[in-house]
Amino acid sequence: MCLLIFAVAASVEANVVREPKPWRALHLLDYSTDDALDALGKDLPTLAKQGINVIILEVDYNFAFKSHPELRRGTNPITRDGATRFATLCKKLNIRLIPQFQSLCHQSWKAETFPLLTSYPNFDVTPGAFPNNEGIYCREWDPLNPEVWRIVFQLMDEIIDAFSADAFHVGMDEIFLLGSEQSPSTKGKDSGVLFAKAVNEIYSHLVKKRHVEMLMWGDRLIDGKKYDFGEWEAALNGTATAVDLIPKDIIICPWHYEVRDNYPSILMFIEKGFRVLPAGWKDVDATRALIGFSQTHAGAKLLGHMFTTWGVKKDALLEFPPLVEGLKLIREIETKKVASKQEQVTPEN
């Protein structure tokens, strides 16, 4: 009997090992030079030991593009050699590295407009409007201009190749200008259809042509009239209908940064067939609540959890409280799940 119990337990352990590991993802930005990536590389062993197995690195225009050098941001952007060096470190530590390029929105921040729209102002969805970026959150590119996609895909290709990436995060959060009265090309048009068209354009290039997995933020796909998340975590401008017009193998990353009793967006995406990677931020209690709800209510399409680090100083990353406490909770939940599986198959004496 003891031998039987041991054999069954060993079988359970073997099955657990063979299952895909839950994603313990860390989103990082402002590592915009080779030196910054090299410094981050020194933290990778500790992050791996803590349990991080996915890094989503927001690159954007901080890369030494060869196809379009005019679109480099800063005087010392990440080089292909620097990217390759960092990717090699990640691979050695079994960390999946996923680069990100903010698409459609986030083409400016405060008074600074980023290289695409400064070099090609005709790509702006609201050309000539909002001087000094006053009166808007961020500038957006025109998804109906085919020249935009031709150039952007060249940038994405360079980043994918440099980081040897098998997945790519395209951003696409906080979009507010589609269908704007100030937008000659999209004025009066259905923002949900426009948004879906943009998502599908990128999907065709990344997934169908480059054969990489595609991730995107989920806020513009959540109906803010149905789910009470407000106009930032959800959409009140019509883009949410795009959720039924895009491929279901896109990985959706809904971000929720406040404590709630439930997070129905996660279940909504899963019920529609998407895989989901929820993201939290700086509030420890909110992080615990999001992880707890996700792990309790979601099934196999829940990939894990993403920790975002907006505003976190680089020298404080390893001790970032939501990261430390969130990983601790995830370990506790995973341990309980393994124990529960063993109890279900272990014969009683």
Predicted regions and their residues:
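The substrate-binding groove and active-site-proximal loops of carbohydrate-active enzymes
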Residues: 24-35, 68-80, 133-150, 184-194, ...
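Glycine-rich, aromatic-flanked loop segments that form ligand/cofactor-binding clefts
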Residues: 21-24, 46-60, 87-129
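Active-site-adjacent "subsite" loops/lids of carbohydrate-active enzymes
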Residues: 104-158, 278
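Substrate-binding cleft of secreted/luminal carbohydrate-active enzymes
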Residues: 277-349
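Hydrophobic faces of well-ordered beta-strands that scaffold small-molecule active sites
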Residues: 24-28, 55-57, 97-99, 168-170, ...
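Short, acidic/polar
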Residues: 33-48, 153-155, 260-266, 287-293
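Aromatic-lined carbohydrate-binding/catalytic grooves of carbohydrate-active enzymes
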Residues: 48-82
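Active-site neighborhood of glycoside hydrolase catalytic domains
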Residues: 146-273, 285
